[in-house]
Amino acid sequence: MGNDVKKVLLVYYSQTGQLAELARNFAEPLQQGGVHVDCVNLEPQEPYPFPWSFWRFFNTFPETVHLKPAPILPPAIPANDYDAVVIAYTVWFLSPAQPITAFLQREETRRLLNGKPVVTLIGCRNMWLGAQEKMKSLLAHNGAKLIGNIVKIDACNSAASFITTPAWLLSGDKQYFRALPSAGIADGELADAARFGAKMRDTLLQNKTLDETLFQNMGAAKVNEKLIFSEKAAGRSFFLWGRLLMAAGRVSPLLRRALLCFYILFLLAMILVLVPVSVLVKKLLH
């Protein structure tokens, strides 16, 4: 490979396959334009199942929220130096997925990312602001320069996806409830990632600087202000209960299990109350 060939590292973890497709769509125009892209799929030491088991799904949240991830296998990264790094991730309990956090906490990652321009590519249900704030902190710890963030969210509305996304993760069926829209990101939105990959390609091949203006005016990440309050409230709940559950686990695994069962029942009760009320309020307002 010639020294003048531009190189991009794309790191991702995909449990359902959706994020892998999003990452491929971003990488394709780069590869077609002659940019060398190393795509690295992170592998947990103990694989996460898909579909999830009910218990393991919920038991994952305390460590996820507190950035104490399960270990990953050492990723096979072919080169030591890249012109840019793309980190594609999904959101677990309003935090980056554990394998991504584990990658960013490796000493080898710090050496790799130090001083490098980084783009984050998020595929999630609809709430991502809290996860991205944690991502910013992790990147800053590694000395990386965050220059852009691209976000693709589920196609159906917030109330519906509150039900359809967990149903998909626990059953493996995107349309488990036939009366509700399909879970996941729309095909057109997944394909739209190529538009941003093409912009990075053009910037690299023109030897221009990769900075915060890279995806300016491209609609890379749209903030839904209506969700900010709900996300903050849920984030506080996850954080406090996560800390309590981890402390309980140090005393007794049975105590952690009992408290987690109580919290799950609390969450289900909230869903059964808040989702219908939310739908009713929206209908009345319209």
Where in this protein do the model-derived segments appear?
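N-terminal beta1-alpha1-beta2 submodule of the flavodoxin-like/Rossmannoid cofactor-binding fold
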Residues: 1-89, 94-99, 105, 109, ...
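Short amphipathic alpha-helical segments and helix-helix/interface helices
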Residues: 27, 104, 132-136
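Short aromatic-enriched loop/helix-cap "lid" or pocket-rim segments at secondary-structure transitions
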Residues: 49-54, 132-133, 158-164
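Second-shell loop/turn segments in exported
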Residues: 89, 125, 184
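Internal, well-ordered alpha-helical segments in soluble enzyme and binding-protein domains
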Residues: 96, 131-135, 189-192, 196
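Short, glycine-/small-residue-rich phosphate/pyrophosphate-handling segment
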Residues: 117-160
